Amino acid sequence: MPTHNLEISGQTLEGAWWGPGPDAAPTLVLLHEGLGCVGLWNDFPAKLAEATGCGVFAYSRAGYGKSSPIPLPRPLSYMHDEARETLPKILDRIGFREGALIGHSDGASIALIHAGAIADPRVKAVALMAPHVFTEELGLASIRQAQEAYEHGDLKRKLARWHDHVDCAFYGWNGAWLD
């Protein structure tokens, strides 16, 4: 996986590219879930690039993966801020010409907010997997269980494999839902 860092608004963001560049083909931008990062996409980006002939770009938001840490708690507007402020800068920086945003969970919400708030003619489509359009008690109960597993089980150890700042990644996600 060819990774490189992007400097965006004073933050270092981990990014990776698969397949052709933005001058050669449309680009599919992957937006990860609340505890995700570039590495957790595993071989999906390479397979997606091969199957579609498109370039695929993924990045780890600040606080995740190998990206810069962030101060906690996150503001409740963090997904809106990412969609309206950070994502447009990333698209510009990578030379995004046209393509789609593909998001899972928090990433799907960010893609949805971006599509609704930014009139970006380069974004031709969005594919959303489990965006946060409403909250269910079952989901909140699962997030509380994740906190228990993180604090008293082995979830922290497992996440530390993927996140340089594991407490930042976990509590940035968990706290946004439970605080």
Task: Give the ranges of each region predicted by the language model.
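Glycine-rich, phosphate-binding/catalytic loops in enzymes
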Residues: 44-49, 73-75, 119, 142-146
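Active-site loop/oxyanion-hole signature of alpha/beta-hydrolase fold enzymes
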Residues: 52, 58-98
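Conserved HGGG/HGGXW glycine-rich cap/lid loop of the alpha/beta-hydrolase fold
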Residues: 14-69
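N-terminal cap/lid segment of alpha/beta-hydrolase-fold proteins
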Residues: 1-12
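Conserved hydrolase catalytic core segment
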Residues: 97-136
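The alpha/beta-hydrolase serine catalytic core
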Residues: 131, 135-136, 140-179
